[in-house]
Amino acid sequence: MQLNVGDSVGQINKASSGEWKLYEDKINKITITKKYGRRYFTKSVFYPLDADDVDNNTKDMEESIGRGYILTKEIFGLNEKTRPYAEKWIKWANENKDKAVGLI
């Protein structure tokens, strides 16, 4: 799954407050070079991103739905499947801090 300019990417991380949070930004540029390959650029939140990594993380995130795990600390595409899954997990994790552990 390749993302396009205007699509959103996100990352689940713990904030300094100890709360889990979804950090997100929109892709505003996509480049392809011999040196770096295909990369996604966002306006402010994330540095240039390896597009293949983000695409693979998006696929992994979609496949994790209903399987008892979620990607944390990895950037993935936010779509109609991954966004609600991430938001639901973050709500659960912040209500169950003793059970929510970022493993992947």
Please describe what each predicted stretch is:
Residues 23-58:
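Basic/aromatic-rich interaction segments and small domains that mediate binding to polyanionic partners
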Residues 17, 40, 78-79:
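Residues in flexible loops and secondary-structure boundaries
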Residues 3, 12, 39-40, 68, ...:
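Positively charged, low-complexity intrinsically disordered regions
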Residues 1-21:
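Short coil-to-beta transition motif at edge beta-strands of beta-rich domains
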